[in-house]
Curated annotation (Swiss-Prot):
One of its GO terms (molecular function) is toxin activity. Residues 1-19 form the signal peptide. The keyword Disulfide bond applies. Belongs to the conotoxin O2 superfamily. The presence of a 'disulfide through disulfide knot' structurally defines this protein as a knottin. It is found in: Secreted. This is Conotoxin VnMEKL-0223. Expressed by the venom duct. Disulfide bonds join C51-C65, C58-C69, C64-C74. GO terms for cellular component: extracellular region. It comes from the Eukaryota. Residues 20-37 form a propeptide. It comes from Conus ventricosus.
């Protein structure tokens, strides 16, 4: 029974190693991290002046950090 368990574990390790080699290995997680790190939080966008805060004059939704331009003023949420 122990030999069968060890054999199954070795087979699982070999199969997972082969899948990593064929799938590109560590490239995919790095690409995912780069994609996620490009996004800025609302606070970062506001701090860098890329969007307007609450109750500031606006003409488009994209100008507001909240994404809501109602009645020419940025909404809070």
């Amino acid at each position: 029974m122990q030999k069968l368990t060890i054999l199954l574990l070795v087979a699982a390790v070999l199969m997972s190693t082969q899948a990593l080699i064929k799938g590109g290995g560590e490239k995919r997680p790095k690409e995912k991290i780069k994609f996620l790190s490009k996004r800025k939080t609302t606070a970062e966008s506001w701090w860098e002046g890329e969007c307007s805060g609450w109750s500031v004059y606006c003409t488009q939704h994209s100008e507001c950090c909240s994404g809501e331009c109602t009645g020419n003023y940025c909404e809070l949420f």
